């Protein structure tokens, strides 16, 4: 944002800042208009991120040049003349460079610099080519502000070349190019830009509110001072943004006002118990503000939470704390220090350092091996940590490095990890501004003395060490990590001191050990993987078949972890979880309704955001078991939501749930078994699945009438039909970006196959995509005079059912496995075509939108057919 000759000029980054914090826009506007000054705040972490972003951009540029691409660089001159830069950008585009770097755009009071313009073969006013925008971002995933920037650049680009591009790309730190379909975000861009313009024109009165952008903001200290001066209610520990908004509606805008609110005062959409907790929290903080006394009190006991979740001490206990650099490389971070405090007779600190990804793997293995070795001597030990980041990081490292899978799974099953932060928050309420480790240390008198005082400082220290290699920097980081471990130990000891003495210790968890049969199957799978991988060339068909054996188990792990994490959440946390419904109570006005041997119970709940729907498998978090079947849910027609829960005889004696959580991942045993069949076939070399092996080996398609190695690239539909009909135990890819007619083409290929008496399967990632293709197939078949009979697999829900002149739906898998030759078309998802009863039963399998299907699922489905069209 700048003012030039009394005119305000804006950039796409101003839109991103507005999206992050509307108050920031008003602060920037005041500085631009000379009504305020920018604080002299030095933000080293923000500078580090800017530097890393520039490294990523420079590396991408170097790659383009190394590939021999022609790159024209447009640089602003010292006067930062955007109009001249815009002219030079247009000249580079007219010259037809492969890439234009630092492309400048200026129009209608907006200006910006796009990282790259990429030439594509699409005619425009420039000639037989045009350009699309690429922007490099250090992020791991695209964010809304990226779409705003790309929309601005693409709109300006469209004016220059007199052709609007269809796509723009975010080049992430991982080097993955993520396409943004501009038609999908144009309305969003226009709406945000209009809101931004209105806010600038009206000089809207805004207030600061803590957000993610604060860590990088020049005005952070200014905002914190204002919040303190105003005694803003946002300063109440653990209060959420939605709760702040609801309190403001009833006139409660200060911490003092909340603390002095009369008990029982209702606030819409805040549960009474939650409001009482917030009021008590504000009261404790107010006491500390006025007297300096840090008071606390124990919360009411809850089964399995707070003090009731604190296990007894064991001689083998450990405390664990991690230090990581999130942007060690643009593509990935580095966990550079694994610190452990061994709680023997005399606590002993041990550090596992890592300065590259191989070192990270060794440090991770060293930590896991250390814990397992102590477990053999002390089977009841626990690993204490503060916050959930440590276990989640270990899970990620296990997946990234493909090592110690079984050992980490074993630790998780045994519930070895104990999050003292979660226990503290449900055990006590204290007059602290937050429940971070640094703030709660005052409860047990821990005082830090190290040079490094925060995780951000540790990252900056480590970044300096990477450039200077001064060992003193590592010593200071290690001292900080050691203090974190000792502070966590101090919290553990304090919790044990204040724990109610008459409270029984929690029972040791059931480790959920695998059955002997499951263990035997897993061992056999591991042995098969080893046989395939050992000695095989990486990325070869044999190697890939071995690595894919574990794909579905790896994919299911995060869903299981999220599920078990959900089981341990408090009602307040479940209220904010979209995979759950919290605060359920029985609807006294609606008695249970008998349905055969089951009862349909009606429960009510406060309106909340959730994704739970009829048919969603739901569990009771109190038991970790099924809560019944949701047959109806209504949260749009009243002040309270209603859910009808059908419970059979086995649930009759159990209490009705007080919350519902989505179950674990969908059963994928059929897909796992199909991939296993393929892997066994490749080990045996029996040639059972030649098309699948050809895909893994990246062999050219084998087509009757086409010479080996001959071209199979064509845009002619009749030629495509001939290729599909000539498939000889092989595969074809239909390629093209969204909206280029792949479904239209696929339908015509399917009808051609059906017309020749072939038995065809239709698959996709979703029922909606399948229905879309089936509708086109029936239309084409009618026009071509092709008559056939088809079956579509449904799951029992209405949105999975399809009915047409040739195709009917059925939810019984046996009907598909037993279907005779009169049924020429079968349609369904991976759960259908992976079944052993369909192995080899089809001539051709067409997988629509195959780009959205994992390789493992495509291969699992492919076991049903001789040929694949993807």
Stretch-by-stretch model annotation:
Residues 12, 29-69, 500-623:
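Accessory interdomain/linker segments of ATP-dependent helicases and helicase-like nucleic-acid enzymes
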Residues 1-125:
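Metal-dependent nuclease catalytic cores that hydrolyze phosphodiester bonds in DNA/RNA
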Residues 87-193, 334-339, 344, 349-365:
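Mg2+/Mn2+-dependent nuclease catalytic core
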Residues 244-330, 373, 538, 550-578:
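Long, highly charged low-complexity segments
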Residues 645-730, 782, 794-818:
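Pre-P-loop entry segment of helicase/translocase ATPase cores
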